[in-house]
């Protein structure tokens, strides 16, 4: 399900599994000037992706991250837009398939009411987002996530939200993505999801590349879930150490025979990720990804297609999982 309606599996094409169109990171105050709030810039940057052959984007902007509490998103008649409607508008304008996520990000970004809600109540809210519409709109979510955790562990309230996400995933059948940075908490998240009965083949652990341990990546993949290297635009701007480390980790996954569990994306979440401001944008992978990865680690065109076409399709649809 995209923000403009259902599509078939063969319409997914080249897919970025973890991006953001509009994003409010004001709770991390040091990022205040850098969050994604400019519809004109969003259109320009997304059009670059479309023009480069990009077809689908999964926008994992969950509750707490949505740019809807500030009067910054408008339609052509200057009417204030809710986040989901603003994403729908840019999808219509560019022709990109945008699949919008739901749920809640991480504890720092939760609304106070979540502490008073039971697990099943939170789950039902996510189910409504998928089956009816997000935040009172008719724009339906087609994905659950990103569902986050702190840097080294899952807090008690984050576990409640994660269990709710698991129950919503089972009821709706859409794929689920977690947020796990610079630590091994992705395995703890998988433990919780699998305890609730979620098929790990419908789960992607985001930001896996930020924890540079092959053993961690291999364990995620061996359980059946997907490893997401989703700051790939950084290959354009990374220092030599980070550049070589990322390439080494990717090659280790492929050499271990785990390519069917590997996903790439850019996680555009700051204005400085835009091409306009020197970043890789949404189009680095579609314009330069294969060339860079072939030169550095010998990635073939067939392998690149597996990562950018086949793997996202299996995650999102469950077909051939």
Feature locations, PLM:
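Divalent metal-dependent hydrolysis catalytic cores, especially in the metallo-beta-lactamase
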Residues: 46-78, 95-108, 140-149, 175-176, ...
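Active-site gating/metal-coordination segments in enzymes
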Residues: 89-93, 97-172, 226, 232-235
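Divalent metal-coordination and catalytic microenvironments
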Residues: 18, 57, 104, 169, ...
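Mid-to-C-terminal alpha-helical segments outside catalytic/metal-binding sites
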Residues: 1-5, 284-321
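Short acidic/histidine-rich active-site segments
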Residues: 176-177, 230-231, 258-279, 304
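Catalytic pocket-lining loop regions of alpha/beta-barrel enzymes
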Residues: 166, 170-252, 261-262
């Amino acid at each position: 399900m995209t923000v403009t309606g259902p599509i078939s599996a063969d319409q997914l094409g080249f897919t970025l599994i973890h991006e953001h169109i509009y994003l409010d990171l004001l709770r991390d105050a040091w990022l205040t000037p850098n969050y994604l709030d400019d519809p004109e810039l969003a259109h320009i940057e997304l059009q670059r992706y479309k023009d480069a052959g990009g077809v689908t984007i999964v926008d994992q902007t969950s509750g707490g991250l949505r740019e809807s509490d500030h009067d910054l998103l408008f339609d052509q008649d200057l009417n204030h837009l809710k986040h989901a409607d603003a994403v729908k508008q840019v999808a219509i304008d560019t022709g990109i398939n945008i699949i919008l996520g739901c749920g809640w990000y991480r504890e720092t970004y939760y609304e106070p009411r979540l502490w008073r809600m039971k697990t099943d109540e939170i789950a039902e809210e996510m189910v409504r987002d998928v089956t009816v519409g997000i935040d009172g709109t008719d724009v339906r979510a087609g994905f659950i996530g990103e569902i986050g955790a702190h840097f080294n562990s899952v807090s008690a309230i984050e576990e409640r939200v994660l269990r709710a996400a698991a129950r919503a995933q089972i009821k709706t059948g859409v794929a689920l993505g977690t947020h796990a940075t610079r630590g091994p908490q992705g395995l703890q998240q998988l433990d919780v999801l699998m305890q609730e009965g979620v098929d790990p083949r419908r789960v992607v652990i985001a930001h896996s590349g930020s924890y540079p341990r092959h053993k961690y990546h291999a364990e995620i993949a061996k359980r059946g879930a997907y490893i997401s290297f989703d700051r790939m635009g950084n290959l354009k701007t990374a220092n030599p150490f980070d550049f070589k480390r990322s390439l080494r980790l990717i090659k280790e996954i492929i050499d271990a025979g785990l390519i069917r569990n590997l996903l790439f994306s850019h996680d555009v979440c700051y204005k400085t990720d835009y091409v306009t401001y020197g970043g890789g944008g949404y189009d680095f992978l579609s314009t330069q990804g294969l060339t860079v990865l072939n030169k550095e680690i010998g990635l073939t065109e067939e392998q690149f297609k597996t990562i950018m076409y086949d793997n996202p399709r299996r995650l999102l649809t469950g077909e051939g999982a």
